[in-house]
Structures are given as C-alpha cells and as structure tokens.
Design a protein with these regions (language model features):
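Conserved ABC ATPase signature
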Residues: 73-77
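C-terminal boundary and immediately downstream tail of ABC-type ATPase nucleotide-binding domains
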Residues: 165-181
C-alpha cells in the first residue's frame, strides 16, 4: 500500500469493508443470496447458511430471527432489518477495518436506536476497527470511543469523543443538531 502506481491499486480492498449511507440490497435476491452469491462469495449451500447466520447474529439479529429471514426478500424486512443485513453483507467478508458512512442517515429515532445497537454489537463481537463518518453528534457520542473532528476537509483534532465534542463551535453544534434534510 506504500508503493505508488496503477499496478498497486486494490491491495487494501480485501481488508476494508464499507457500508454506504445509501446502501443497496439486491431486491430480487433472498437475504442468503445477498450475503453470499450476490456479492461474489461462493460457498457450498450448507456453509453459506451457517456463515450467514453467524454474520447476521454479529449484526444484531437473534439466532432464530437470523434463520427465519434467510429466505426472505429485502422488501419483506423492516428498514432496520435491511440495514442490519447490509451491515452483515460487509461483515461476512471479515474485514479488518469497517467504514460506516452516515450509518443513521435519515432514519427515524426508533430505527436509529436499533442500528446503533447492531453496530455496537458487531463491533464488540468481531473486535475490529470501525470508522464512522457522521454529522450526528448524538450518535457519535453514543457509539465512538475516539473522534477525529474535521473542518474544511482537514482533521483538526483527534481524541476522546467527549473531549473533542467539547471543542465544537456554537455554529457547528447548531448544524449538527439539525435533522438531516
């Protein structure tokens, strides 16, 4: 990763999992397919089912619910369940670093709490690094143990979450406390 040039591209890709704010599940594929075949993972069916169940549990589903939803289509799931399946889609690849881009986006408060718990559960379960990109300071306060504050596209402070949040300007607090548009 330290060597420049086009032939060195993609070397870190296998170590990083990324969940975009506007994640997408394949609407005409089952949850099991969304966690395996649809993202290029080829497992024998029994192994695929086992790995999917374990990964869904990491994303916050109870074991019985994990088994129950494998044959469902994304439209048959709630918004929070779809988000957890999308998180599982990232986790099933066993990344060393998980990047979550605005994981709560425009969610309602109940779904946001559900997603917060699933992220915390998976973070504790796999014990890997999670990087959360968010303007939702309440969410950041609840989920992050360290924080990097950016202004104008540059990191200006890194430290314990409470310490960094204490240095927000009044204007930043106002902007970050507003619900997403």
């Amino acid at each position: 990763m330290t060597k420049p040039g086009v032939d060195q591209r993609g070397r870190a890709k296998e170590y990083i999992g990324l969940l975009h704010q506007e994640y997408d599940l394949y609407p005409h594929r089952t949850v099991l397919d969304n966690l395996t075949d649809a993202i290029g993972l080829e497992f024998p069916k029994e192994l695929a089912m086992r790995k999917a169940i374990v990964t869904l549990k990491m994303a916050g589903f109870p074991e019985e619910k994990s088994k129950e939803i494998l044959d469902r289509m994304p439209a048959q799931l709630s918004e929070g369940e779809r988000h957890r399946v999308a998180l599982a889609q990232v986790l099933i690849r066993e990344p060393k670093i998980v990047i979550l881009d605005e994981p709560t986006g425009t969610m309602d408060p109940i779904t946001k709490i559900d997603v917060k718990h699933s992220i915390m559960h998976s973070r504790d379960d796999i014990d890997e690094t999670f990087i959360v990109v968010s303007h939702d300071m309440e969410f950041v306060r609840d989920i992050c143990d360290r924080l990097a504050l950016m202004r104008g596209g540059k990191i200006v402070e890194i430290g314990k979450t409470a310490d960094v949040l204490a240095h927000l300007t009044e204007d930043e607090r106002k902007v970050m406390s507003q619900p997403p548009a």
